[in-house]
C-alpha cells in the first residue's frame, strides 16, 4: 500500500504540470489582458471598444499615451519577458507556493485565497455533509421499497428538486425567510453578524450556523438526486448477487444480510466519493449562491479574476484547486481500503 501511495504522489507532479501548462498557454493566447484593460481605464474607454481593439491585436487603445507608459505597464505585469520565460518563472515560483500579487487588489494571491477560503469551505463541507446525511438513508429506504408508491413518489420529488436552479431557489428562500415579503427568520447576507466578535463561543457557533443555513440549503438542493439514486442502485445491484442468494438459502434474516453483508459492499463507492463530492461542491456550486447572498468566497473570486484577466489569481487558484483534487482522489482510494481491507491497490 505504501508503494501505491508513493506512486500516486509522484504522479501528481506530471499531472499538475500538464494541467498548468495547458491552462497557461490557453489563457495567454486569449484576447484581452490586464494591459489592455488598464489602458482602457486610463483613456476612459468602454470595455466593448477595448475588446474590439484587442481582437485586432493592436494597441490603438494606447493612442494618446506615451510609449514609455505602455512599456511601464508591460513591465508592471511581467509582459516585457517572452512567454516561455514567463512560463518557466511561474513554475519555479509555484514550487515554492509563491503565486505573486494580484494585478488589481494589491495583495498576495496566497493571502487572498486564505481570506476567501473559509466561506467556500463552509458552504462546500456543510452542503456535502447534508447531502450525504439525507441521501444515504433515503437511498437505502428506496432500495428496500423498490417500485412501491413511496419509492416512486420520492423519485419524483428529488428529480423535481434537482431541476430547480439553485439561484432561483435562493431567491424564493430570501423572499419567504430572509426579510422579503413574509418572515425575517434568517439574515440576508454575510457569513457572520456585525457583532460577531463580541459574542460568546456558543453565540458565535449559533450565529455562524444561522448565516449559512439558507446558502447550504440552496447548494444542497441539486445534489440529492444523483447520490440518492446511486445509493439505491448500488444496494439493488448487491441484492441481486449470488452471495445474497446463498445467504438467504442458508436461512439468514433479511436484516442481517442487508446490514452485515450488502451494506459494506454497496456503500463503498458512495463513501469513498465523499472527498471528490466535497471538492465538487467547494469549487463549482457556490458562485451564484455567493453572489445572491453576498458571500465573498473563492467562487466569486475565481469568476472576477477570469473576467478581469487577473492572471496571478487565476493561476494560483487553479494550482490550489488542481492539487486538492489530486489529493482528494488519493484519499478516496485510501477510504476504499479502510472500508474494505480486501481491496489491494498495489496490484494496479
Name every feature range the model reports, one short phrase each.
Residues 2-3, 117-118, 126-127, 131-150, ...:
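Alpha-helical transmembrane segments of integral membrane proteins
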Residues 6-12, 16:
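N-terminal signal-anchor/signal peptide hydrophobic helix marking the start
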Residues 12, 116, 120, 156-159, ...:
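Residue-level signal for discrete positions within transmembrane alpha-helices
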Residues 17-21, 87, 125-129, 172-173, ...:
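Hydrophobic alpha-helical transmembrane segments of multi-pass integral membrane proteins
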Residues 19, 23-27, 32, 170, ...:
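Juxtamembrane/transmembrane-helix interface segments of polytopic membrane transporters
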Residues 23-29, 157-189, 218-224:
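Membrane-water interface segments at the C-terminal ends of transmembrane alpha-helices
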Residues 69, 74-136:
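An internal, D/E-rich "acidic patch" concept
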Amino acid at each position: 500500500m505504501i508503494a501505491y501511495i508513493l506512486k500516486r504522489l509522484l504522479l501528481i507532479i506530471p499531472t499538475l504540470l500538464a494541467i498548468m501548462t495547458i491552462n497557461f498557454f490557453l489563457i495567454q493566447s486569449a484576447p484581452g489582458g490586464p494591459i489592455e484593460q488598464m489602458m482602457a481605464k486610463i483613456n476612459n474607454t468602454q470595455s466593448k471598444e477595448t475588446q474590439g481593439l484587442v481582437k485586432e491585436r493592436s494597441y490603438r487603445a494606447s493612442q494618446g499615451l506615451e510609449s514609455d507608459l505602455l512599456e511601464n505597464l508591460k513591465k508592471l505585469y511581467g509582459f516585457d519577458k517572452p512567454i516561455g520565460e514567463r512560463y518557466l518563472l511561474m513554475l519555479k515560483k509555484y514550487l515554492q507556493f509563491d503565486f505573486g500579487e494580484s494585478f488589481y487588489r494589491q495583495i498576495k494571491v496566497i493571502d487572498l485565497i486564505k481570506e476567501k477560503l473559509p466561506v467556500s469551505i463552509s458552504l462546500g463541507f456543510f452542503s456535502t455533509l447534508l447531502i450525504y446525511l439525507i441521501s444515504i438513508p433515503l437511498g437505502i429506504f428506496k432500495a428496500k421499497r423498490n417500485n412501491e408508491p413511496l419509492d416512486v413518489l420520492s423519485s419524483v420529488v428529488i428529480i423535481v428538486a434537482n431541476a430547480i436552479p439553485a439561484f432561483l431557489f435562493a431567491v424564493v428562500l430570501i423572499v419567504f425567510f430572509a426579510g422579503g415579503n413574509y418572515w425575517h427568520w434568517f439574515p440576508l447576507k454575510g457569513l457572520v453578524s456585525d457583532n460577531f466578535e463580541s459574542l460568546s463561543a456558543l453565540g458565535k457557533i449559533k450565529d455562524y450556523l444561522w448565516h449559512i443555513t439558507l446558502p447550504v440549503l440552496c447548494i444542497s438542493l441539486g445534489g440529492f438526486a444523483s447520490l440518492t439514486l446511486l445509493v439505491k442502485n448500488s444496494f439493488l445491484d448487491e441484492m441481486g448477487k449470488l452471495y445474497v442468494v446463498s445467504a438467504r438459502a442458508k436461512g439468514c434474516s433479511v436484516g442481517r444480510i442487508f446490514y452485515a453483508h450488502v451494506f459494506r459492499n454497496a456503500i463503498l463507492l458512495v463513501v469513498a466519493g465523499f472527498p471528490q463530492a466535497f471538492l465538487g461542491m467547494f469549487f463549482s456550486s457556490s458562485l451564484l449562491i455567493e453572489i445572491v447572498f453576498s458571500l465573498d468566497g473563492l467562487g466569486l473570486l475565481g469568476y472576477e479574476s477570469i473576467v478581469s484577466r487577473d492572471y496571478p489569481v487565476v493561476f494560483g487558484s487553479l494550482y490550489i484547486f488542481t492539487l486538492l483534487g489530486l489529493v482528494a482522489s488519493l484519499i478516496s482510494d485510501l477510504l476504499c481500503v479502510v472500508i474494505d481491507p480486501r481491496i489491494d491497490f498495489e496490484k494496479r
